[in-house]
């Protein structure tokens, strides 16, 4: 059984915004609609998405590289390091992406580290409407180190 640890999210969240090309307009409209709420938080985004959000809203955005150029992996690393609290990722389920493995890895990391994740506008709307969005919150994160050690030992014995 894995142990859990508590990770505190402050009232001012670190929110990362990502959108595939066909969903960038949808995300920008969502950000504009929620601008009064989002201005109370710190925004991050992958390259092109961040540029569009910043230009379209005048909200400050810390930008990573473009998704296909490693931005999704940068975001995943920041999630694993506990530096990002919320993922808003409007992805296109009907359009194959050249960096699909990176997208899958990012979503896996978001689940593994138990960060709130919205992949469509309805979920993002519910998220920002939640009272938890505006208060500090402690999320539970499983400690997988024991399971990893057990796996590595079993692999060593199998050799």
Give the role of each language-model region:
Residues 44-46, 63-65, 89, 117-121:
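General beta-strand structural signal in soluble alpha/beta enzymes
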Residues 106-127:
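Short, acidic/small-residue loops that bind anionic groups at enzyme active sites
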Residues 122-155:
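Short, glycine-/small-residue-rich phosphate/pyrophosphate-handling segment
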Residues 40-49, 53:
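Short internal beta-strands
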Residues 15, 36-43, 112-115:
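Short active-site oxyanion
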Residues 42-43, 59-70, 138-141:
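Short hydrophobic/aromatic-enriched beta-strand-loop microsegments
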Residues 72-112:
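Mid-chain, well-packed structural core segment of small domains
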């Amino acid at each position: 059984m894995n142990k859990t640890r508590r990770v505190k999210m402050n009232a001012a969240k670190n929110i990362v915004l990502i959108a595939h090309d066909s969903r960038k307009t949808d995300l920008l409209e969502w950000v504009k609609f929620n601008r009064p709420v989002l201005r109370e938080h710190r925004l991050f985004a992958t390259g092109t998405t961040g540029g569009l959000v910043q230009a379209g809203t005048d909200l400050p955005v810390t930008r990573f590289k473009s998704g296909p150029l490693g931005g999704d992996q940068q975001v995943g690393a920041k999630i694993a390091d506990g530096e990002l609290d919320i993922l808003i990722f409007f992805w296109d389920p009907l359009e194959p992406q050249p960096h699909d493995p990176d997208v899958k890895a990012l979503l896996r990391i978001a689940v593994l580290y138990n960060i709130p994740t919205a992949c469509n506008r309805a979920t993002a709307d519910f998220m920002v409407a939640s009272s938890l969005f505006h208060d500090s919150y402690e999320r539970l994160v499983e400690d997988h180190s024991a399971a990893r050690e057990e796996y590595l030992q079993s692999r060593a014995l199998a050799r």
